[in-house]
Amino acid sequence: MSLDKPLDGGYKRRMNFRDRASVFLATGFSIGKIPIAPGTFGTLLGIPICFGLAELGAAGSIAGVAAFVLLAVQVAGRAETLIGKKDAPVIVIDEAAGLLVTLAGLPLTPFNLAAGFAAFRVMDILKPFPARRIDRNMTGGWGVVLDDVVAGIYSNIFLRVMSSFCF
């Protein structure tokens, strides 16, 4: 069987359970298949995950963010291979990971959630250095996720600086 011809659903090969699970997780439980602004909806998916991780305490929450990023790298890389397109818009687990990094170590107040969401979306779109370089030059799961992690780091710093001046 040739891997060059798309099969059912446009995937590059027939999918086993692990493949289907990877695509399902990478697309944010199929949220990424929403035709308008899938990245925005994928970012929203990160909010309930943040609340779940907050229940683990500070150290557990940070460990949970790291574990989620590693999971995102794994499933995004596998999904990208199956879909056959670099950083396909339907892959949104990276947006959720970026929001988790944005809010890591911060109280989950309505202000932080709204400002963090907005800051992350802006940083994800602008892709400040080195995010754009990572997005262009890295391949596989790390290439899909790492630019969003960088955007999340910038957004986290922005929120911390903003809160030190405002509150």
Where are these regions (language model features)?
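Interhelical loop and helix-boundary elements at the membrane-water interface
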Residues: S2-L44, Q74-T102, V122-I153
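Membrane-embedded alpha-helical segments in integral membrane proteins
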Residues: G42-L53
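Aromatic-rich, lipid-facing transmembrane alpha helices and their immediate juxtamembrane interface loops
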Residues: I47, G105-L106, G140, S163
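Alpha-helical transmembrane segments of multi-pass membrane proteins
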Residues: F51, A66-Q74, G98-L99, L103-A104, ...
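Transmembrane helix-loop junction
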Residues: F51, E55, T81, L103-A104, ...
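Transmembrane helix interruption/hinge and helix-loop junction motifs
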Residues: L53-G60, G105-N112
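Alpha-helical transmembrane segments and their juxtamembrane interface "caps"
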Residues: L56-V73, V90-I93, A115, M123, ...
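Juxtamembrane boundary at the C-terminal end of a transmembrane helix
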Residues: L159-F167
